[in-house]
């Protein structure tokens, strides 16, 4: 198969003393996200999408939250590992589309920086990376500012042999 599509979804609750990292970018906010790793919910959803596209499970399988080795882990390292696995199967980035679902913080000022980080990690142009944000109009846990949800869809393309 020459193309593969993967979908990823992740949620993290606000809390703790860690800084808020989204898409590899530090976002000024009153709190971070509770997680076993650094809590970068954007990179977790993308990692799941990449793994799903090449039928390699999910990040919980590769980086279990019961393993102390991954406590506080840099999610960019985890993402790069997932992408390396896809490249080992002969795939490279076609395009990526990410939706950040959060009432707060406002994401618009940070979108371009996130796109640049992702383009760097996926060794591609920012034209292949889309990041957008939306709210739930104050409905649900994201609307109550209890956490952030992220959906990611990735298209991987088989490299020419």
UniProtKB/Swiss-Prot annotation:
Q: Which PROSITE patterns match?
A: ISPF
Establish whether keyword Lyase is in the entry: yes
One example of the protein's molecular function in GO is:
metal ion binding
Cofactor section: a divalent metal cation
> Which Pfam families does the record cross-reference, listed alphabetically?
YgbB
| UniProt catalytic activity | 4-CDP-2-C-methyl-D-erythritol 2-phosphate = 2-C-methyl-D-erythritol 2,4-cyclic diphosphate + CMP
Would you say which domain of life the source belongs to? Answer: Bacteria
The annotated subunit structure for this chain is: Homotrimer.
Name of the protein in its database record: 2-C-methyl-D-erythritol 2,4-cyclodiphosphate synthase
Phylogenetic classification of the source organism = Bacteria, Pseudomonadati, Pseudomonadota, Gammaproteobacteria, Alteromonadales
């Amino acid at each position: 198969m020459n193309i593969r599509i993967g979908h990823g979804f992740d949620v993290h609750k606000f809390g703790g003393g860690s800084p808020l990292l989204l898409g590899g970018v530090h976002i000024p906010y009153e709190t971070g996200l509770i997680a076993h790793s650094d809590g970068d919910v954007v990179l977790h959803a993308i990692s799941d999408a990449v793994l799903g596209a090449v039928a390699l499970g999910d990040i919980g399988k590769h980086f279990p939250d019961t393993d102390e080795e991954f406590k506080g882990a840099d999610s960019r390292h985890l993402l790069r590992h997932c992408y390396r696995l896809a490249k080992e199967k002969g795939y490279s980035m076609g395009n990526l589309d990410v939706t950040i679902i959060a009432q707060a913080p406002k994401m618009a000022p940070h979108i371009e920086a996130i796109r640049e980080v992702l383009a760097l990690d996926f060794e591609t142009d920012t034209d292949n990376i889309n990041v957008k944000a939306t709210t739930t109009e104050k409905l649900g846990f994201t609307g109550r500012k209890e956490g952030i949800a992220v959906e990611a869809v990735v298209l991987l393309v088989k490299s020419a042999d």
